[in-house]
């Protein structure tokens, strides 16, 4: 490490901030108000120090024979360090980041010790920081301080050795949610219009607005004129959106408008602004379907009701004008939805705002939109299977999905390219415009689009069969729609729910629909012999044998009888439970992985937040508290372990069988959140949510064990003789 240096003369007593919050957000902690370079005192010299070896300290003759390990002295008050940001950051990376990836992890082979000068000694007395966790936290703090333009900082020791459970939860609540928040209006159009999936080669930004939203259209036209550098085109959507129109507009793709609200500025003028929403990860700018539901669960835990409500409002807007909750709000997604969760989402938000003015109107609008989507999307052709009465993921569309990489389907298409003596571009155009007819290829893309609508892209469970499957996940969700709608009509609208077109809905009809779906699911999806819920192939009229964690959704929705739940927990739960939580599918169902059978991200051994959360709520709904806590601890341990050992990362999914590095997932899409530089800035939406939701299931014993990174097996062995208190204050909708 470099030796100590003299820099500014800083009066450390004058800037002492013992009363300041050491766990404030980075934006607050590294604000200009705490900038040491603005607090210079000419009267008394002090020194700032970078991290350094103790032997490099200046020699004082009178003390040269005294050797004290000041860094190991006991102390009652938390220390504060005076730090030169750039020099300490560079020295830290040089010494500790041995693989040069801008992270400090357990895989780096540096000494794992640095020394910092204390503020109370003016940077003279050095104290050691040891271990991966403290050093990676130091790297994160220095990176953030540099982001905020800080040259020198007064860094509280408590910020470096903070309990990792508290630190991660604090970051999610105070930093990650804000970093993932977007809105669509003039203030952010230059960022929000960017589309990493746009293959058209055009440099034109486009936004498409519903025909009925004239004020919104004029707003964006005005914004385009005021900001010519945006190169923004504002287009009206046609009244009727057809597969042909969606195909044709792939040559000029664009963003789809979302809800806006009116507000008054300080001068009393009225303006429009976008209703905010949360995106799945840092590289996204769109409102996604089922990601938003799980994010809302975490947002509500963290009292970010405004964002959860905003996403419901945006979904109402989408159903009103685009006919469905979209995969995401881009033109190429106009025919594709995602797993529907709107009733539960709206009810949870309503519970938090029910005493506010307009809350009942909010609930009415949300459920009116849900009923429209239910009838026109999920129980209509082509998604409804008339014989079973069950529904399938089966979106419309023509040609090859345009949002994929240009080469994504090249291996599949090459035989056809050779057959017709065409290049990839030539064949793609001819096929998309039905100049070439290949029934086998048509069927492939019907299933491919269905897999994408399911949200489970990709998995061997759904590959080449998805559009024919009445899946347990979709039908559990629709059962939940039916029971929620029945409950809301009866409890909140006196059993008379008037739709915008004047139609009156009663609870009885929705109750009958729910009972009919439950009977059909028991007949076609439930296996008494296997104690398992399976998908049903409506074309072959046979049950699938793939064991998927979506079976837990039947418990979450309340489809299962108590007897079925008991059999499922006794026989099937052990097939999914591994060291890190619930795997997406069982090892038996995956089969042998090889060159011709590569790993898929929604298969064993990977685990995803949606499957964990729905399993927790499903199990606790039927009274399985011990099993719920066990699964919660496993999943939170997986996230916490990666966070502690790998520089604070929070990733999209985890390999639940890897005890050391579960964030490393070997699958076709990689893993978002792995390649951070210095600090994780937003985590991943539904993983953030799963952590916050999971902590609501934890008692103090579990939190302490997680903070100490106690492995699940050790923790469970320690509590085998001990009874844990019952769950309290869990929000579980059992309608």
UniProtKB/Swiss-Prot annotation:
Outcome of substituting residue 97 to L: Abolishes calcium binding. Abolishes activation and increases cellular trehalose level during osmotic stress and thermal stress
Residues at which Ca(2+) binds: 97, 99, 101, 103, 108
Effect of mutating residue 6 to A: Abolishes activation during osmotic stress and thermal stress. Increases cellular trehalose level during osmotic stress but not thermal stress. Does not affect binding to tps1
Modified residues (Phosphoserine): 49, 51
GO CC aspect terms: alpha,alpha-trehalose-phosphate synthase complex (UDP-forming); cytosol
Induction details: Induced by thermal stress and osmotic stress. Induced by oxidative stress.
Catalysis: reaction(s): alpha,alpha-trehalose + H2O = alpha-D-glucose + beta-D-glucose
Compartments, as annotated in UniProt: Cytoplasm
Pathway terms, separated by semicolons: Carbohydrate degradation
GO biological process, one term: ascospore formation
Gene disruption phenotype: Increases cellular trehalase level during osmotic stress and thermal stress. Resistant to heat shock and osmotic stress. Delays spore germination.
Region (Disordered): 1-55
Regulation: May be activated by phosphorylation.
Entry-linked InterPro entries: 6-hairpin_glycosidase_sf, 6hp_glycosidase-like_sf, Glyco_hydro_37, Glyco_hydro_37_CS, Trehalase_Ca-bd
The enzyme's E.C. designation: 3.2.1.28
UniProt-annotated catalytic positions: 457 (proton donor/acceptor), 652 (proton donor/acceptor)
Single annotated GO MF: calcium ion binding
Residues bearing the modification Phosphothreonine: 47, 50
Family: Belongs to the glycosyl hydrolase 37 family.
Subunit structure as annotated in this protein's UniProt entry: Homodimer. Homotrimer. Oligomerization occurs only in the presence of calcium. Forms a complex composed of at least tpp1, tps1 and ntp1. Interacts with tpp1. Interacts with tps1; interaction is independent of stress conditions and oligomerization state.
Functional summary from the UniProt entry: Hydrolyzes intracellular trehalose to glucose. The disaccharide trehalose serves as a storage carbohydrate that is mobilized during nutrient stress and spore germination. Together with tps1, regulates the level of trehalose as a protectant for cell integrity during heat, osmotic and oxidative stresses.
Entry protein name: Cytosolic neutral trehalase
């Amino acid at each position: 490490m470099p030796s100590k240096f003299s820099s500014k003369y800083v009066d450390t007593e004058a800037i002492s901030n013992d009363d300041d919050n050491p766990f404030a957000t980075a934006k607050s902690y590294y604000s200009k108000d705490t900038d040491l370079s603005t607090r210079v005192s000419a009267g008394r010299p002090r020194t700032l120090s970078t991290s350094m070896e103790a032997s490099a300290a200046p020699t004082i003759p009178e003390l040269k024979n005294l050797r004290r390990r000041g860094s190991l002295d006991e102390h009652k008050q938390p220390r504060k360090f005076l730090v030169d940001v750039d020099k300490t950051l560079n020295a830290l990376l040089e010494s500790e980041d041995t693989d040069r990836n801008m992270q400090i992890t357990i895989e780096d082979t540096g000494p794992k010790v640095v020394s910092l000068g204390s503020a109370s000694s003016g940077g003279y007395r050095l104290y050691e920081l040891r271990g991966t966790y403290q050093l990676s936290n130091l790297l994160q703090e220095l990176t953030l301080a540099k982001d905020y333009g800080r040259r020198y900082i007064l860094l509280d020791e408590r910020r470096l050795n903070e309990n990792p459970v508290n630190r991660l939860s604090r970051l999610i609540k105070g930093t990650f949610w804000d970093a993932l928040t977007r809105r669509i209006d003039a203030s952010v159009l230059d960022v929000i219009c960017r589309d990493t999936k746009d293959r058209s080669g055009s440099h034109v930004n486009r936004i498409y607005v519903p025909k009925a939203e004239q004020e919104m259209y004029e707003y964006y036209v005005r914004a385009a004129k005021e900001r010519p550098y945006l190169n923004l085109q504002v287009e009206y959507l046609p009244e009727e959106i057809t597969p042909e129109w969606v195909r044709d507009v792939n040559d000029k793709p664009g963003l789809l408008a979302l809800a806006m609200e009116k507000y008054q500025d300080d001068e009393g003028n009225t303006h429009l602004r976008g209703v905010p929403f949360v995106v799945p990860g840092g590289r996204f700018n769109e409102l996604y379907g089922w990601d938003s539901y799980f994010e809302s669960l975490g947002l509500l835990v963290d009292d970010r009701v405004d964002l959860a409500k905003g996403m419901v409002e945006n979904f109402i807007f989408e159903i009103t004008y685009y006919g469905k909750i979209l995969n995401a709000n881009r033109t190429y997604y106009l025919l594709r939805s995602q797993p529907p969760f709107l009733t539960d989402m709206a009810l949870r938000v309503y519970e938090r705002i029910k005493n506010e003015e307009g809350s009942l109107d909010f609930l009415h609008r949300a459920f009116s939109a849900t009923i429209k989507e239910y009838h026109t999307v999920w129980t209509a052709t082509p998604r409804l299977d008339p014989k079973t009465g069950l529904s399938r993921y089966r979106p419309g569309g023509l040609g090859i999905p345009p949002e994929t990489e240009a080469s994504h389907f090249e291996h599949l298409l090459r035989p056809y390219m050779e057959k017709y003596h065409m290049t990839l571009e030539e064949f793609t155009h001819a096929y998309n415009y039905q100049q070439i007819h290949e029934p086998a290829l048509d069927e492939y893309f019907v299933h491919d689009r269905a897999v994408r609508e399911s949200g489970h892209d990709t998995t061997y469970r759904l590959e080449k069969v998805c559009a024919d499957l009445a899946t347990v996940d979709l039908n559990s969700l629709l059962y939940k729609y039916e029971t929620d709608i029945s409950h809301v009509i009866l409890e909140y609208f006196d059993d008379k729910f008037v739709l915008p077109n004047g139609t009156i809905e009663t609870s009885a009809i929705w109750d009958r629909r729910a009972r009919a779906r439950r009977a059909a699911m028991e007949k076609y999806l439930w296996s008494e012999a296997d104690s398992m819920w399976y998908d049903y192939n409506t074309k072959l009229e046979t049950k699938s044998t793939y064991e998927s964690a979506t079976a837990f959704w039947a418990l979450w929705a309340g489809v299962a009888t108590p007897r079925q739940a008991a059999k499922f927990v006794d026989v099937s739960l052990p097939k999914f439970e591994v060291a890190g939580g619930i795997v997406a599918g069982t090892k038996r169902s995956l089969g042998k992985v090889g060159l011709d059978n590569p790993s898929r991200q929604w298969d064993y051994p990977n685990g995803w937040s949606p499957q964990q959360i729905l399993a927790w709520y499903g199990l606790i709904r039927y009274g399985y508290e011990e099993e719920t806590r066990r699964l919660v601890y496993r999943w939170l341990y997986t996230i916490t372990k990666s966070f502690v050992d790998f520089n604070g990362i929070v990733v999209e999914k985890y390999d639940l069988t890897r005890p050391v590095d579960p964030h490393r997932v070997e699958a076709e899409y990689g893993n978002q959140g792995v390649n951070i530089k210095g600090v994780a800035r937003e985590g991943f939406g539904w993983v953030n949510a799963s952590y916050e939701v999971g902590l609501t299931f934890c008692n103090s014993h579990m939190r302490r064990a997680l903070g100490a990174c106690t492995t699940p097996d050790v923790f469970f062995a320690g509590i085998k003789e001990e009874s844990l208190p019952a769950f309290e204050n869990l929000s579980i909708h059992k309608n």
